[in-house]
Amino acid sequence: MFLTSRKLVCYRSFFTLATVAAYLSVAWAKAEPINDKRPFTVQDSIETSYIIDPVASTIIEIRDTQPVGSPIFSPDRKHFLLITQRGILKENHLEATIWLFDQIAVSDYVRGKSPSQPVPRAIARFSAPGNTPAISNVRWLDSSQVAFLAKDRSPYQQLFIARIDRGSPHAITPHNEYVSAFDISGNVVAYTSLIPPQPAKGSEDDIVDVTGKNIYTLLFSRPRAIEDVDEEQLQTYASALHILRNGKELPVTFRTGDGQLRLFIPTLSLSPDGRWLITVAPVGKIPSGWEAYEPNSKWDVLRLRQDNAYAVADENPWKASQYVLIDVQSGDVSPLVDAPAGRGLIFLAPTKAFWLEDSRRAILTNTFLPVNKDSDQKERTTSPAVVVANIQERTLRPICFLQQTLPPSERLSVENILWGPSSHQLTIVYTGNSGSKTAKIERYALRPDDSWEQTVSSIDEPPAELSLSVEQDLDHPPVLVGRVPSHTEKVLIWDPNPQLKRVILGKVTRYSWNDKFGNKRRGLLALPPDYDPHIRYPLVIQPYGYDPDRFFADGAFTTGYGGRALAAKGIVVLQMETLMTHYRLPDEGSFQVEGFKSAIHQLAEDGFIDRGHVGILGFSYTCFHVLQAITHQPDLFEAALITDGVNTSYMQYLLATDHGVVQEQFEQTIGAKPFGRGLLQWYGSSPGFNFDMTRTPLLISALERGQLLEQWENYSCLRKLNKPVDMVWLRKENAPHILVQPAQRFLSQQMTVDWFGFWLKGFEEPDPEKTAQYRRWRELRRLRDEGRSSASIVLNN
C-alpha cells in the first residue's frame, strides 16, 4: 500500500471462554484421537470456510476479513441462507457458496423432534481469482428468489438471480461489466458498473508537469488489472448508473451540473413504485458553508473548504458527497440534502436509504443536516444524523443524531442500521472500542401521526421459539447453533469445516499484564499443540490488533501473520494489542518498545518462553515500532520481519510530498521537520538514522506497488553496514495491503513461518525450492555471528 492516511490510523491469567467455548468444545469432542491428527498449516488457514456477511459495505474502510454472517430469512420465514467463503490454494481462487436451510427441519432438530441433523443445499457456488468476495450483496427478492453479485471464474462481477426450487443462477448483467451495486423493485433494476479507469491526463506524455503530483501517481499511472483491485482500491473507482425495465436498459443519461453522473461506493435504493432512486453522489465543487462541518478525529485535510482540491479528488476515498434523488425516467439528478454525507468526513456509519411504502418518504442514514439560524449549529456540524426526507415537499425531519462516545470514555462506532418495513421500526447497533461485542442498541418506531418514538421493541428477529446464531471462539471457526426456550444448552446445527477435526489446533487464550508504567496490556497467546509447561519456548510477537471473539487462525491480519501455523512449529505466539495512547507523539516509538519489553518479561516470568529466543513481525503502521525496537534495543529480538509498512523514515517523508497527511504525521511523531535543527531530532528518533546500532536479522517484504521504493532505505542502509538483512520483492507489485488471494497469502505467511523457524528453532524445510532461501539465511547467520564476535571483542577491550 502507498503511504495513505488509512495506513496511519489504527485504532498472566488464562481463562476459559465461557458459554461459547463450552458447547463448541463438546461439539468437537467427537473428533478422532490426537494421534491421527496433523499440525495446522498456512494452507489450512487459507482453506478454512468462514460464514460471512454478504451485505455490500457502504462504509469507507479497510477490512481485514469479511464480517461474520448470520441467517438471512426468507419473507415467509420458511427458509434461511448462510454464505461461506474459503480460499482454494491450488487454483488461487476464492470460492463462495450460498447455502439454503429448511427452517422446519432445523427447528425439529434443535427441539429434539428429529434425530436427523439438517443438511443445507447449495443453491449457488462461484469461484474466481481476485481480491474481492466471490459472492456478495445477497438478498431475497421474494420467498422463492435470491439476488446477489458473483464472479464466475472471472474477475468481473455480475448480478445473478437464483430460484431456490430449481435450476442454476442466471446472470442479469453482461459478463464484461464489473457490477458494483444494485437494487431491484418490481420490474425495475438499478445497478452500477465500474467505469474502466484510464491513465491520468498527461501522465504518459514525454514531458510531464509534476507540480502538485505525488511520486506514486507519476510512477504508477497505469490502472491495475481488475483482478488485482481490492475493496479498498474500489473506493476510488467511479461507477456508472444503469436502469433496466423488464430486462431492457432504458436509454437515459444521468447528468449533474458537473457532467456525467459518477458514483463512488454506490448505495442504491429504488422507491417501491420504481420511479425514484436515492444514492450518494460526489460534489464537483464544495458548496458555500460546508466548511463549518467538522471532520471526525480532527482530520483537517478533509475540511470542506472551497479551496481544498483534495476534498473532491478522485483519489480521495473520503471525497465530499451528498444524498441525491434521481428520476429514473428523465435522468434528472437533484440534491436531496443540502449538507454533506457523513462518510466524507470519516464518520464510518452505514450510508443507506430506506423507502417508506408511499414512495414519497425515505429514511436517510449518516448525513449531516443543513445549518440555519434556528437549528442547533454545534450538533448539526459535529454529528451526522438519521433523517426522514419527503421528496415532494423537500423537507427533512431528524430522527436522531449518531453518537460517537459513550460516557465515561468508551468510543462508539455504528455497526449497523436496520429498517423493518413491516414493523416500521429503525434499529441502530453500536459497538465499542473494547471489542466486537454490541455496546448499545437504539430503536425508534414510526407512529401513525408520522412522529418517531424511541422504543425497546425488537425488529425482524427470528421466531421467538427458535434462536439461531453463528458463533465462534478463539479455538473454533464459525458454526451455526440453535436454541429453544425449553432447552438451556445450544445445539450445534452445522459446521462448515469438518476437515479441521483431523487437525491439531492447539490452544489460544487471553493474556494480560501491566507494563512498568502501570498500563494494562493484553493479547492473545497461542501455545504449541503439544505444549509442555516444563519447557520454555521461543516467542514471536505479532503486534496490531486484538479480537478475543474471533477464531484465531493468523492473527490480526493475513499479510505476513503466521499465527496458529507458527504455533504448530513449536513457537509461542503473542497477538499483542497496540495501545494508541501515544499515537502521533514524539515518545510513541519508545512507548511501544516498552510494551514489547514488558510482554517478554511477563511471559518469561510466567515460565512460557525463553527470553533469548524472541522474534517480532511488523505490518503496516507497526513496522515503525519494530524498527524502533531493533535500533534502540538491539539485543531484544533474535529476529524481526516487516511487511508493507510505515518506517517513519527520512526517505518515506520525502516520498510523501503532495500525498495526503503523511508528512504531517511524521512531523508529529518525531516532533520536528527533518530540516535544520529539526534534523537533529530525527537523528535520535527515526530508525533509519540508527541502523548502525542494530544486530537483529531483518527480513523485509515488499509486496505492494511502491513498496520496493519505500523499503529501499531500510535495505540499503543495512546492506551498506554489512548487517544481516534479506529483502523479497513481489515483482508484479500487484498485492493489496491486506492479502486476499490464496497464492499471495501463502507466499507471505509461509515465509514468516520459515523465517522464524530458521532463526528461533534452527529449522529448515526439506523443500528443494527453498534451497536458495536457506542459503541466503545461513549467510546472514554468519554475518550476525561475526557481528556478535566483533561486539564482544570491543566490550572486552
Put a short name on every predicted segment.
Residues 1-11:
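N-terminal secretory signal peptides that target proteins for export/translocation
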Residues 13-25:
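Bacterial N-terminal signal peptides
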Residues 27-466, 474-476, 483, 707, ...:
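Beta-propeller folds
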Residues 69-71, 276-281, 287, 441, ...:
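Non-catalytic accessory segments flanking enzyme active sites
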Residues 190, 278, 468, 481, ...:
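Hydrophobic/aromatic beta-strand patches that form the interior of the parallel beta-sheet core
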Residues 282, 367, 472, 542-546, ...:
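Glycine-rich His-Gly loop
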Residues 494-612, 619:
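Cap/lid segment of the alpha/beta-hydrolase catalytic domain
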Residues 559-569, 573-797:
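Active-site-proximal cap/loop segments of hydrolase catalytic domains
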